[in-house]
Amino acid sequence: MEEKNGDAKTFWMELQDDGKVDLMFEKTQNVLHSLKQKIKDGSATNGDYVQAMNLVNEATLSNTQTLEKGMFITYSNPEVNTHRSNHTPVTQSEQENKSSAVPSASCDNSCPKGCTIPSPGKKVFLPVKNKADNLVKKEAPLHISFHRHICSRTCLMETPLSLKGENPLQLPIRCHFQRRHAKTNSHSSALHVNYKTPCGRNLRNMEEVFHYLLETECNFLFTDNFSFNTYVQLTRNHPKQNEVVSDVDISNGVESVSIPFCNEIDNSKLPRFKYRNTVWPRIYHLNFSNMFSDSCDCSEGCIDIKKCACLQLTAKNAKACPLSSDGECAGYKYKRLQRLIPTGIYECNLLCKCNKQMCQNRVIQHGVRVRLQVFKSEKKGWGVRCLDDIDKGTFVCIYSGRLLRRATPEKTNIGENGREQQHIVKNSFSKKRKLEVVCSDCDAHCDSPKAEDCPPKLSGDLKEPAVEMNHRNISRTQHHSVIRRTKSKTTVFHYSEKNMGFVCSDSAAPEDKNGFKPAQEHVNSEARRAHEDLSSNPAGDSEDTQLTESDVIDITASREDSAPAYRCKHATIVDRKDTKQVLEVPGKKSQEEEPAASQSQQALCDEELPSERTKIPSASLMQLSKESLFLLDASKEGNVGRFLNHSCCPNLWVQNVFVETHDRNFPLVAFFTNRYVKARTELTWDYGYEAGATPAKEILCQCGFNKCRKKLI
């Protein structure tokens, strides 16, 4: 430092001896005056802006004045030096000794338009404009260095006024964290992501992020707000120029994040339905305290399976099921699902004494956090897409609807069924003509107690009436629970002994000698035609109140005589014998395949996912229970999950999660991403239809992948 000070002193002494000190300052003043005029009249270039910013940064102005319009980013190594005064210049020798770091994609689109990124050899400060940055911020110099200290609450900057509606991965940036892509060393060719905290500390993985949030007692940032995936970009959310948002929030504030609706195809609106994000009736106060088999009292975020009883419960059931992979830890990993758990995930419940904010075993109970948009596609009807990049294992939404119970199920003989089928087929064509001219209003609203209290209308021909679930119907006995999808425009009943579905598990195993029946998760191939039928079904249509015309996703618990500790009872199954329905979508032309997806996305589909390696044949499905059939009806009430489309190479997993009860008959059906999903990509899941099961009623698939099964239903 003394040598550097001596060099500076020698420099000015030489100028003084030559009588050029005044000349040097006059030149500096001329430069400042020129920059001032260019900035005022708008003729300044990006280089002029950067030069002026650096000069102001080195001047004697206060930091609040220099940071009033934005933040500063330095592309030098964040670990060099201690806290440096903003007035101290940086010499060339210091810059040469610093290793470069490549800025994260989160900052790429934040610079002014046309701004060029400086070379790593120079230290340049660039203003970063944060989108929707209408907050009152504290001073946040991003060239801060790390002082060895014990992190606490004082390490965090002021909490933003509001974080609702933001990209969840952008929230750390809003809170003055830096997300950087950097090389581990000069010889490395791969980039890695790290975060730099407001106090200068580097976070290199999720474990370090978790411990930092614990140490600082942060209650507004969580582990799922961070992503170390180099493919994830934080600002790739630019909408199309011709996009017109018809509804800013179809949930009407029910969800913590707005879910807009956009139609770029025509002027049709969403069907009228009641938006609900729960399956339980709102007018009843249900007591779930006696429906939990265990609870925890963790104080360190429920991350240690040796201490957390809820994690142990998930692992115990997964280990007892032969469909689970050996050697892998069951459950979430820092609030992200890395693989499917056939036996279900047991989240921490209301009896647990752990911190609800820092608990890593509470995910879906926090609700939708990613930004979604309902839109209309050219061939597949209504669909859902993400507005931001989503990392693998991220929770998207649940499948919600109205919980009903089918009472006194009766079998209909084949002769009567044939006559009923003929009658319904005839009615379907007249109904088609009526539905073609009817357009429902896009009037999604929240549940009302009066609507919940009204029983559904039942047709006189309905052999299996359904009644709504209430607190008197719910018990812990073994039941056969079903999730019902929204109706299609035309529903045809038929009798079929064949079951179908796809297995959401790692492998298949037959019944063992002890009578153990493995858990099986099968998704109804008839359960996902909401996007094609909802646009023409007004809420007040009396024909639509026939509950047996809804698509069904069957979630059942098998009845084994084996010990409870070795049971793997939970399953999601479709039984065509019980549903007795075939969907026929009128008003649709013969479907044509869309162009194949990009090679990178196709490669992900060509490689079999662990959950799709083995399919259990229909003959080995479990015998459905004939008692107390529970239905989850989304035809009139539901959430954004009712609009999710099918794909033979889906980007969503279907996972059963137990939150409000440990009763195996009442899981929540949750959707998680099974890979990285780029912004504005449609979110899909596999309906699991077996091609050839019902050849007369099959519909062509529209997913467009090379390994497409070609048939949707």
UniProtKB/Swiss-Prot annotation:
One of its GO terms (cellular component) is cytosol. It is found in: Nucleus; Chromosome. Its EC number is 2.1.1.366. Pfam families: MBD, Pre-SET, SET. Keywords: Cell cycle, Cell division, Chromatin regulator, Chromosome, Developmental protein, Metal-binding, Methyltransferase, Mitosis, Nucleus, S-adenosyl-L-methionine, Transferase, Zinc. Residues 294-367 form the Pre-SET domain. Residues 161-233 form the MBD domain. Belongs to the class V-like SAM-binding methyltransferase superfamily. In the pre-SET domain, Cys residues bind 3 zinc ions that are arranged in a triangular cluster; some of these Cys residues contribute to the binding of two zinc ions within the cluster. This is Histone-lysine N-methyltransferase SETDB2. The gene is Setdb2.
